């Protein structure tokens, strides 16, 4: 059942974290058993679909650049850095990386398993504006910005994650 919040009451740490990840107490209960909830499984499938479209977009750039080079539409300049060849190489590498990430996420979805890690959470510094990460027991996890802001750094948490991609699916403070 969805988390219901009294608008006048302050949020507990658990409630803040659950809201930041879009999960419920039932999700956390299943995570504690080492399983993904149906809602978490659905979210991972949506993430994989988004990665698929990203891979197609980057692959299209690679194919377009290769076509331009083959047909002579794309002129190879004297400077390698100004050349479409460098764009082709970057696009191909990005496509391979996206395909690998997509396949890793499929392994996590098919397994449906969740691992847990108990320990103090620290912020990774410096943070870039487009990615946020935390470290617990020398293991780094990328998290959404809203989840990053929900942590109280230095305190102990249980982090639930899928093992292959290290994607965080649930977090709760240790009491």
Predicted regions and their residues:
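Short acidic/glycine-enriched loop/turn segments that link adjacent beta-strands
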Residues: 128-130, 165
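Alpha-helical transmembrane spans
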Residues: 40-111
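Cytosolic juxtamembrane N-terminal segments of multi-pass membrane proteins
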Residues: 2-52
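Structural detector for short beta-strands of small beta-barrel domains
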Residues: 107-128, 158
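Beta-strand/loop nucleic-acid-binding surfaces
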Residues: 139-151
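A membrane-cytosol interface segment of integral membrane proteins
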Residues: 149-175
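Cysteine-centric segments in proteins
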Residues: 20-34, 102-109, 148-153, 174-175
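Short, acidic/hydrophobic/Gly-rich beta-strand patch recurrent on exposed beta strands
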Residues: 131-138
